[in-house]
Amino acid sequence: IKASNGNGFYYAVSSAMLGLPVASKAIKVVMEDESFPKTASIIRAIWLAGFPEYARLEAFKRIREMTSSDILALSKLDTYLAIRLATRKYGYGSLVYSAVAFPKPYRDIVERASNTYGISPALIYAVMRQESLFDTYAISVAGAKGLMQLLDGTAQYVARREGIRIKNLFHPETNILLGVAYLRYLLDMWNGDLVRALASYNAGPTRVKDWNSTEDVYLFIETVPIAETRNYVKRVLYNYYVYSDLLK
């Protein structure tokens, strides 16, 4: 039943097991020209007048009247705003209008990080989408920062290991490179076990070492004692399956 609702972790796993494309329900949205649709034009005018925060508030007030073309147009103005609108309107895991809900920003940086650390762009985008919804200036309650949501201590540790200078942790290139380097470190720690690496990215490797030692990855996921981490792993894996299809 859980696998049949058209999106989410169980849907992605069952589709992959059957050799079916996870993103088969994705609908491609194409703007017919470069002009902004009516509602998007109003938001854009407010934004360009120098009131980006008011523009964001106005966008959410008008979300019911927005079409997919409006949201796609706004993605050219602010990726973070567009994906928040898309996930609010269609749901976090919805494959409808995937060009908006599953964007691929910072392609050059992601490709470089992928080549440097041997991690697929699909996985990098999957983590980034869950961590920050592509908000460059995101800050969590715990103090994690940027696109890949790195704590200062973690960022400094990885920077020393990799010889990366941290001028600004909110800088996309710095944040992505450090986040991918840390993910590589965790994957190596767990001998390539993606599920435990993702759990460690969220909850820390020390905690994960104390959890279920089963080799059954699905049993491990379902027995993760922290609900936030359990849901985090499922969402990142779902994102990963979707991006793997979209990037083919």
Describe these PLM feature segments.
Residues K2, N7-L18, Y54, A59-K248:
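Catalytic glycan-binding domains that act on GlcNAc-containing polysaccharides
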Residues L20-K25:
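Short, solvent-exposed, mixed-charge loop/turn linkers that connect secondary-structure elements
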Residues A26-P37, Y97-A101:
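TPR-adjacent "capping" and linker segments in tetratricopeptide-repeat scaffold/adaptor proteins
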Residues V30-E32, P37-S41, T67, N168, ...:
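Alpha-helix initiation/capping motif
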Residues E34-S41, G50, P105, L178:
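Alpha-helix N-cap/N′ positions at the starts of helices
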